[in-house]
């Protein structure tokens, strides 16, 4: 029993150390040596629980994405048009990546590491089928899975490319939505209404509040305090 509790305690400390380091330094700049030191665990303990940093990223990704959907629902209301909820959630994710470079790196890595992106594909496919099935009658789960692979590539590419004076955040959000909603055969009139709704949101202010709330939630979940 003692060894099981010790393993759980080591896992908790590793997660706490990694999440804090990822947020403060970035995923790529966080070394295994730093994780071991901060978590106060041996290399054998670390590799027995997590084989790579990517394995830790998988747990973090699952938690972060779950929180995003909950927050988006609170912004537009749980009973709203599900397509609008999808638009708000994806636009918030793109905006969060613009507000914080370490978050951008976490998101981009999440869409790159094989086990992570597969988790995203599977979870998002379920959501996409619920949201867009009325527009695509007769489409199966495998059809939505294949479409998710494509729209996830849109998301990764747009998150990885920082905005500038020409490719502004507003243009990025509008282009992403027009591309993804077209994939799911959302009528043009409805697309325009959704784009208008997003344009009238103060998306930067909302995303900043979401980011601060996310940081507080992560601190509570993984028991650490950010230093910056």
Describe the residue ranges of each PLM region:
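The short coil/loop that forms the "turn" connecting the two helices of the helix-turn-helix
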Residues: 9-10, 41
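Generic hydrophobic, amphipathic alpha-helix propensity
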Residues: 10-18, 35, 60-64, 68
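Helix-turn-helix
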Residues: 21-55, 59
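Hydrophobic alpha-helical connector segments
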Residues: 59, 70-103, 113, 121-125
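Secondary-structure edge/capping motif, primarily at the C-terminal ends of alpha-helices
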Residues: 72-76, 104, 158-166
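Short, hydrophobic secondary-structure boundary micro-motifs
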Residues: 104-109, 189-193
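Amphipathic alpha-helical packing segments from all-alpha helical-bundle domains
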Residues: 111-163, 167, 171-178
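C-terminal peripheral helix-coil segments that are non-catalytic and often amphipathic
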Residues: 130-134, 164-228
């Amino acid at each position: 029993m003692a060894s099981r509790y010790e393993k759980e305690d080591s896992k908790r400390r590793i997660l706490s150390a990694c999440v804090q380091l990822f947020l403060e330094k970035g995923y790529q700049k966080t070394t295994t040596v730093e994780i071991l030191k901060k978590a106060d665990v041996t290399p054998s303990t670390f590799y027995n629980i997590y084989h790579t940093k990517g394995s830790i990223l998988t747990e973090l990704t699952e938690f972060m994405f779950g929180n995003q959907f909950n927050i988006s629902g609170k912004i537009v209301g749980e009973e709203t048009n599900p397509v609008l909820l999808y638009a708000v959630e994806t636009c918030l994710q793109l905006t969060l990546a613009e507000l914080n470079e370490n978050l951008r790196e976490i998101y981009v890595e999440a869409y790159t590491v094989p086990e992570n992106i597969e988790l995203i594909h599977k979870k998002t496919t379920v959501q996409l089928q619920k949201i867009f099935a009325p527009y695509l009658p007769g489409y199966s789960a495998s059809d939505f899975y294949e479409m998710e692979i494509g729209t996830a590539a849109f998301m990764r590419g747009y998150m990885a490319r920082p905005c500038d004076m020409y490719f502004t955040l507003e243009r990025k959000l509008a282009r992403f939505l027009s591309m993804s909603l077209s994939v799911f055969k959302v009528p043009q009139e409805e697309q325009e209404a959704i784009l208008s709704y997003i344009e009238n949101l103060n998306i930067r202010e909302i995303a900043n509040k979401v980011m601060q709330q996310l940081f507080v939630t992560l601190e509570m979940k993984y028991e650490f305090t950010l230093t910056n």
